[in-house]
């Protein structure tokens, strides 16, 4: 009579008297990438919950792979039971407690109050001192208010380098440039650098992962020009290894938003660099043209002995050349400098997404390693004369591989969840910044082009007097008065475009009066007064001579 239960030849493998008991407790796996955050205590409870759930699932998988296999009915029942006990995916509250904790809303507010430049010429340009006030409710700070905090640009750079490597979940905003094309001694440079650092602080304070890092507290509370990163951070890959890994095809990314985001950021990076090169070339050519315009105007000034109109016209041409030089500088200071910040930030975002690809590739390797350890353990089960020590070693390796896979899985989930949120924030910042840069570039260009028009209108009446018909005979505008010397920029609008919009008197005065009015009018008035005195003296002398001749 045969038994209804099939015979299992490996049923006695689990009765190993030398095997160590299975440990049910496990360490939390969902840790931050930097390992130095001072806010980790508040995440321990939630992370241990998620880690224990996944550890139990991992232990069940190990036991299912190496535990005894009963008959077909028992195995089917156990599989159904395991499917019912399958752990669920951790929620966003578990993965990112910094963003989901509504009870603890930590803030960090900073207001830039000044900018100082001292030291050598290189130090003044590349290492200015930023002065700011700070208020916060973070527990990592010793107090809530900080006044007149002074930090050099080099200290800001040290902080950025640490945060960019330590916090792999975030797109750490890059520092603005330490100087602008306006020149370090100009008021425009001071105002723009101050405004850019204020924008940088605003972006930094919007990221809860950054402000909760204890290195930010060390930075603000340290003395002036003494800060160096306290904690150490190590990049995933650098140097030749990083260049080699970037040549490989990126792993499959099931998150469509991030899979399409990196090519977009790279295209922004490449296009912005191309625009910078073209703007630089245009600016250089314009400055070469300015030299020719100044030489051309000086040649007319040298002809003043023939007619005073040449002197006035030459001075106007020289002033027009100077305005073209200002326009070339404004193009660089507005649009070129704006694109420079976009290039830096796009590169940092692109490298952060590349680090995520490295973690995805490490996770794939960890999954393959875990599967190989499971296959090795199953092969050990098929042998009856296997050494129990080898079985224990295989179990330990399998558990270590499963734990490594679990750590990388939670790490990737944390990075992915936070990058999806910051993707929208970065795109909105990029659109707003490029819009403001183009607006400033356009308004400055219009302003100085109108000033150039105002200068040319100064000699319009003199040039028309050179023609008996007023210089308008070939244009067919006979109704226009020959003595019209009014400027085209009025409160009613621009007469060249036919617009009749109401405008403020302040911008009209700014356009109708240029930086060269004092020089032009002073020299012209002096020339006219000297010329009139000479003319009157010659008339008296002529009259006296005529009177003497009649006697």
UniProtKB/Swiss-Prot annotation:
GO biological process, one term: intracellular protein transport
Highest taxon listed in the record's lineage: Eukaryota
GO MF, any single term: phosphatidylinositol-3-phosphate binding
Coiled-coil ranges from the UniProt annotation: 359-385
Sequence segments annotated as region (Disordered): 1-100, 474-504
Pfam families per record: PX
Coarse class of the protein's main subcellular location: membrane
Intracellular or extracellular location(s): Endomembrane system
SUPFAM superfamilies listed in its UniProt record: PX domain
Membrane topology of this protein: Peripheral membrane protein
Domain PX: 108-227
Phosphoserine sites (modified residues): 544
Disruption phenotype: Leads to hyper-fragmentation of the vacuoles upon hyperosmotic stress.
Domain notes: The C-terminal half, which contain the coiled-coils domains, is necessary and sufficient for interaction with VPS5.
PANTHER family cross-referenced by the UniProt entry: VACUOLAR PROTEIN SORTING-ASSOCIATED PROTEIN 17
Note: Present with 7380 molecules/cell in log phase SD medium.
Stated name of the protein: Vacuolar protein sorting-associated protein 17
Species name: Saccharomyces cerevisiae (strain ATCC 204508 / S288c) (Baker's yeast)
